């Protein structure tokens, strides 16, 4: 959906380019800002309940986004997706952290990151023919179907790790966040890395529109953006083992 979100907001919903970019930017920022807090909540209720909630929110959000492409529905749907996605990030990283040892943790996270990029690669691979043959709305229904399947699989096969009641309170999490942003060296590093992410996210914010407007509607920004996840999923485990 990332690869099509600004296209969908402007071409289907009716936002202009600037508003669509702002909405997409806030959506992406929320996905990365919320995990410390949704992760604390996931610790409290248990990872299994939290991931079921997450996939439920994602299924609802994607379906509403595709079924009712009007501004009054799309914006709340994106908020639902933002919270659902932020749960996934924190739960999966938490599961890896709690089910690996110091010796296996690096390998565990590399496998997790590799699988994330397998999903990113396959998602954009299917998004291209869906966009051409059935339109941008179909990508949302495809995403809703995939998250619904994930919800069913999680319900039957995901075993909870021992997380209930172990998490920190939201107050403690917020205090930790304040300590982080007052660490000058870390903040400088974050700003440096942020420069990279600003450029990288243009693959989703502006590149699709640029390619389609300059090359034509038959062009494939999806495959251009696929270079990144392809390189990651084929090299991350190997590099980690070096």
Regions found by a protein language model. Name each.
Residues 56-70:
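C-terminal ends and interior cores of transmembrane alpha-helices
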Residues 25-40, 227-239:
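Central cavity-lining transmembrane alpha-helices of secondary-active solute carriers
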Residues 87-101, 211:
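Intracellular juxtamembrane helix-capping segments at the cytosolic ends
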Residues 137-156:
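Symmetry-related core transmembrane helices of the 12-TM Major Facilitator Superfamily/SLC fold
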Residues 106-132, 146-147:
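Glycine-rich segments within core transmembrane alpha-helices of 12-TM secondary carriers
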Residues 164-190:
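Juxtamembrane intracellular "pre-TM" segments in multi-pass secondary transporters
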Residues 2-6, 184-222:
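Extracytoplasmic gate region of multi-pass secondary transporters
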């Amino acid at each position: 959906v990332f690869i099509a979100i600004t296209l969908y907001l402007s071409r289907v919903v009716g936002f202009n380019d600037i508003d669509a970019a702002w909405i997409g930017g806030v959506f992406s920022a929320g996905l990365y800002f919320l995990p410390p807090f949704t992760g604390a909540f996931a610790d409290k209720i248990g990872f299994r309940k939290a991931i079921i909630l997450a996939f439920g929110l994602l299924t609802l959000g994607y379906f509403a986004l595709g079924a009712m492409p009007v501004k009054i529905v799309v914006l709340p749907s994106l908020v639902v997706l933002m919270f659902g996605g932020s749960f996934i990030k924190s739960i999966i990283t938490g599961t890896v952290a709690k089910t690996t040892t110091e010796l296996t943790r690096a390998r565990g996270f590399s496998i997790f990151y590799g699988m994330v990029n397998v999903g990113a690669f396959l998602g954009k691979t299917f998004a291209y023919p869906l966009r051409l043959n059935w339109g941008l709305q179909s990508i949302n229904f495809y995403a809703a179907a995939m998250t619904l399947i994930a919800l069913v699989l999680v319900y039957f096969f995901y075993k909870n790790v021992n997380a209930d009641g172990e998490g920190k309170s939201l107050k403690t999490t917020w205090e930790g966040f304040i300590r982080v942003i007052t660490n000058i060296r870390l903040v400088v590093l974050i700003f440096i890395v942020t420069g990279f992410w600003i450029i990288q996210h243009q693959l989703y914010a502006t590149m699709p529109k640029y390619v389609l407007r300059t090359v034509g509607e038959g062009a494939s920004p999806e495959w251009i953006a696929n270079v990144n996840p392809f390189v990651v999923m084929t090299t991350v485990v190997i590099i980690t083992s070096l």
